[in-house]
């Protein structure tokens, strides 16, 4: 059979498995590729290959992640699976693999465990919008009442962290059976097929980056005699067209301006799009009115803030992080997009110190405003050295 070429016409959705160690995340990941290859014609990936996930670096942090892909009838899925709990924490906080939805794998034999809870909390903090549940190892549970009990526990846990527990789809099955091609009582391949159909129906198509409101972090500012001020950067999302009204947000008071030209590789364009490095010519803006670290945005789409709740991963000594813990009142630099801003860290009640390698919820107060939204990633630095990674969980002011 000829090798199929990647079908760009199918909408692309990013998912991943989350849940407690040994509840069957990797087995389910392998089973998904197997079932989808038989039903929808994508490639099979073996358990061992997923389990020995390669190391990758995201923002200087080493993370082991396995990436697989599979198709349903209507979509192309990119799926991430992490071997260790620490890898999940790092992955979700750095946004190395952002998920449009997560598959929570919970063993029906054991019920929710500490990491089940922690992964749901992390999903909430980093803004994973949808969770679908797969109750695994159901072939080991003879008692229907026990299954119901575990299902109720999982729903309660989801509701605790503001996911719609009562309405979350829960599929009951056995990933091992599906991987072995068995299907007694529809627990094997049928359950995985049902899972894929649920992903199709429950997780909506993600909004494409290009359809979101325009945002470009400013990396550099030039003044071109006779033409005015040009700001350069890589467009993070959306489209900017000549004559669009724009706002410059962060570090100082927000100012209003107009795009009078877009340049890329010294050519003039009518518009700049997400992912492109370009220069935007601004009308009526002086060279000294703008600086690196501000963002150029569609008016009203992003506001400047200084205080927020964050979920943070502190690099271990081995990862080049701090060798010693830090305490309340810690004042490092927070690196947002293109600039560092000093901020003060408030630790949760009862937490005296934070050790390298920990992940922690903290409240940060910056000394200058930054254009920010929930889900924005940042690095924590000391004198230019990265010592942590974080994500804005909730804006306070």
UniProtKB/Swiss-Prot annotation:
EC number from the UniProt entry: 3.6.5.3
Span list, region G1: 19-26
TM regions (residue ranges): none
InterPro entries hit by this protein: EF-Tu_GTP-bd, EF-Tu_GTPase, EFTu-like_2, EFTU_2, G_TR_CS, P-loop_NTPase, Small_GTP-bd, T_Tr_GTP-bd_dom
Main location: cytoplasm
GO molecular function: GTP binding; GTPase activity; guanosine tetraphosphate binding; translation elongation factor activity
Segments of this protein annotated with the region G4: 136-139
Binding site for GTP: 19-26, 81-85, 136-139
Keywords: Cytoplasm, Elongation factor, GTP-binding, Hydrolase, Magnesium, Metal-binding, Nucleotide-binding, Protein biosynthesis
Main enzyme class: hydrolase
Keyword Hydrolase annotated: yes
Residue span of region G3: 81-84
Database matches in SUPFAM superfamilies: EF-Tu/eEF-1alpha/eIF2-gamma C-terminal domain, P-loop containing nucleoside triphosphate hydrolases, Translation proteins
Residues the entry annotates as binding Mg(2+): 26
Span of domain tr-type G: 10-207
Region named G2: 60-64
Family the entry assigns: Belongs to the TRAFAC class translation factor GTPase superfamily. Classic translation factor GTPase family. EF-Tu/EF-1A subfamily.
Protein name per Swiss-Prot or TrEMBL: Elongation factor Tu
Source species of the chain: Pseudomonas fluorescens (strain SBW25)
């Amino acid at each position: 059979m000829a090798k199929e070429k990647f079908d760009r016409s199918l909408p692309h959705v990013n998912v991943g498995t989350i849940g407690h160690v040994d509840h069957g995340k990797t087995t389910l990941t392998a089973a998904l590729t197997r079932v989808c290859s038989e039903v929808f014609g994508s490639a099979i990936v073996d358990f061992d290959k997923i389990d020995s996930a390669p190391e990758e670096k995201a923002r200087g942090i080493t993370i082991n992640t396995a990436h697989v892909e599979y198709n349903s009838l209507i979509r192309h899925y990119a799926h991430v699976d992490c071997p260790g709990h620490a890898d999940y924490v790092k992955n979700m906080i750095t946004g190395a693999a952002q998920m449009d939805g997560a598959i929570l794998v919970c063993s029906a034999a054991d019920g929710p465990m500490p990491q089940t809870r922690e992964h749901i909390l992390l999903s909430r903090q980093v803004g994973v919008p949808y969770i679908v549940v797969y109750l695994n190892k159901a072939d080991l549970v003879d008692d229907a009442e026990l299954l119901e009990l575990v299902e109720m526990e999982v729903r309660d846990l989801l509701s605790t962290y503001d996911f719609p527990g009562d309405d979350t789809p829960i599929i009951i099955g056995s990933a091992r059976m599906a991987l072995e091609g068995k299907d007694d009582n529809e627990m094997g391949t049928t359950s995985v097929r049902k899972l894929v159909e649920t992903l199709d129906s429950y997780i909506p198509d993600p909004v494409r980056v290009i359809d979101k409101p325009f945002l470009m972090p400013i990396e550099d500012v030039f003044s071109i005699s006779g033409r005015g001020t040009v700001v350069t950067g890589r467009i993070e999302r959306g489209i900017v067209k000549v004559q669009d009204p724009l706002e410059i947000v962060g570090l100082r008071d927000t100012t209003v301006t107009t795009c009078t030209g877009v340049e890329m590789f010294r050519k003039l364009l009518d518009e700049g799009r997400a992912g492109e490095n370009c220069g935007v010519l601004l009308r009526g803006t002086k060279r000294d009115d703008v600086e690196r670290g501000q963002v150029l945005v569609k008016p009203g789409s992003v506001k400047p803030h200084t205080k927020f709740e964050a979920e943070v991963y502190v690099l271990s000594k081995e990862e080049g992080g701090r060798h010693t813990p830090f305490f309340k009142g810690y004042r490092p630099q927070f690196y947002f997009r293109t600039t560092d801003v000093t901020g003060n860290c408030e630790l949760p009640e009862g937490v005296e110190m934070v050790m390298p390698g920990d992940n922690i919820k903290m409240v940060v107060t910056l000394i200058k405003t930054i254009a920010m939204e929930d889900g924005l990633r940042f690095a924590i630095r000391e004198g230019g050295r990265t010592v942590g990674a974080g994500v804005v969980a909730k804006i306070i002011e």
